[in-house]
Amino acid sequence: MAMVKRNNNTGLIPVSTKQLMALGAAAGASALQGFVRNNGAAIVGKVVDVGQKVYKAVKKRGGKKQQQIKHVGGTGGAIMAPVAVTRQLTGSKPKFTGKTSGSVTVTHREYLSQVNMSTGFQVNGGIVGNLLQLNPLNGTLFSWLPAIASNFDQYSFNSVLLHYVPLCATTEVGRVAMYFDKDSEDPEPADRVELANYSVLAETAPWAERALWVPTDRIKRFCDDSSTLDHKLIDLGQLGVATYGGAGTNAVGDIFISYSVTLYFPQPTNTLLSTRRLDLAGTPVTASGPGYILLTRTPTVLTMTFRATGTFVISGAYRCLTSTVLGLTGGVNVNSITVVDNVGTSSSFFINCTVSNLPSVITFTTTGITSATIQCNRATRQNDVSLI
C-alpha cells in the first residue's frame, strides 16, 4: 500500500519513499542548523578540548622512555636491509641528435660487466692496466659505442653514469665500490686506504643498488687510435669497480654505463679488430685495435687473458713442437672451436667464446712455444668457427 498524507481538503495524495526521505533529510538539516546556532560556542570548546587531549597522548607515547619499537641506528644516509630488493630493467633506445654539421650526439646505456664478490680487496676483477679508460673507442669499456666512434676523430662526453644493480640476496656480505680517476694512467688502488681517498667514489652493500655520476668538462679530445703514448691526453679519465669483504666469489650484481657523447669530425673507419703479436723471444711487438686480450707466453703455456666481457671470435697461430691442450679459467665458455696442430712446427686455432665476468683466461699447453699472433673481435654465437 502506498504511503499517503492529508491535505487541507482532507484528500489523499500518494507520496513515494524517495520523496519521504528527502523531506526527512531537509527537516534534519534544519534542526541541526538551529542546534549549532544556539550552541556554537560549546561545540567549538569541546572540539578544542578533545584535540588537546589527543596531542598530549601522542606526545607522551613518543617519549624516549615509553617508545616500544626501536630500530638499529646509523648516521645520515644509512639504510636498513629489507627482506628482498630488486630492480626491473627495461631496454634502452639509443638517441642520435645533431646541431652542428659534422657532429652527432649519441645517448645510450650499455651493459659493462657482471660483478663477482671477493674476500680480499680486488679491482676490476683482478685485471690491471687501466682497464676502463673513458674513451669512446675503448672496447673494454664500451661494446656498442666503438662501432660508431670509429668513424670520428674527436669526442666530448656530456654526461656519464655508472650504475650498479644487485642480483644477490640481502644476506650477502661485503662491499661494492665504484670510483672515477681523472688521470687515466694512474695505477688501480692497491687497498681500501687508497680507495677511500678518491673524491668521486660510491660504495654500497652488494644487495643495494648505487649510482656514480662522473664529472665531465665537455672538452674535445681525440678518439683512441692505439698509437697514443700518453693516454691521459686523450681520455676523460678512468673508471674502476672494487669489491672486498665477501664470503666467496659468487656473482652479486651487474654494472651498466649510461652516457651522452658528442662525436666530431668524420674520418675513415678505424679498426675494431684487436691484433696482438709476440716475437721469437716472447716480447710484444704489435698491439693494435681494442685491448680485448692480453697475450703472454712461457715455453710451455700460451696465455690469453680477457680484459672485456662479451662474445668474441679469436683466431691465432703460434710456433710449438707438440700437440696442444686447451685450458679455460673463470667465466669463459667456448661456443665453437677448431684447433689444427702441425706437430713439430706450429699450431693454429679458431675459438668462438662468451666471457661473462673477469678474470677469464684461455690457455694452450704444449712445448717449445716461441712466437705467436692472435686476432680478436666482438661477434655472436652464429659466427660458428667449427670445421665441417
Curated annotation (Swiss-Prot):
Location (main, coarse): virion
Gene3D superfamilies, per the entry: 2.60.120.20
Keyword RNA-binding: yes
Alphabetical list of Pfam families matching this protein: Coat_P, Viral_coat
Keyword entries, A-Z: Capsid protein, RNA-binding, T=3 icosahedral capsid protein, Virion
InterPro entries reported in the protein's UniProt record: Capsid_prot_S-dom_vir, Coat_P, Viral_coat
Segments of this protein annotated with the region R domain, interaction with RNA: 1-102
Chain segments carrying region S domain, virion shell: 103-263
Chain spans, region P domain, projecting: 264-388
An annotated GO cellular component: T=3 icosahedral viral capsid
Localisation per UniProt entry: Virion
GO molecular function: RNA binding; structural molecule activity
Residue numbers spanned by region Involved in encapsidation: 56-61
Family, per entry: Belongs to the icosahedral plant coat protein family.
Record function comment: Capsid protein self-assembles to form an icosahedral capsid with a T=3 symmetry, about 32-35 nm in diameter, and consisting of 180 capsid proteins.
Subunit structure: Homomultimer.
Name of the protein this chain belongs to: Capsid protein
Higher taxonomy: Viruses, Riboviria, Orthornavirae, Kitrinoviricota, Tolucaviricetes
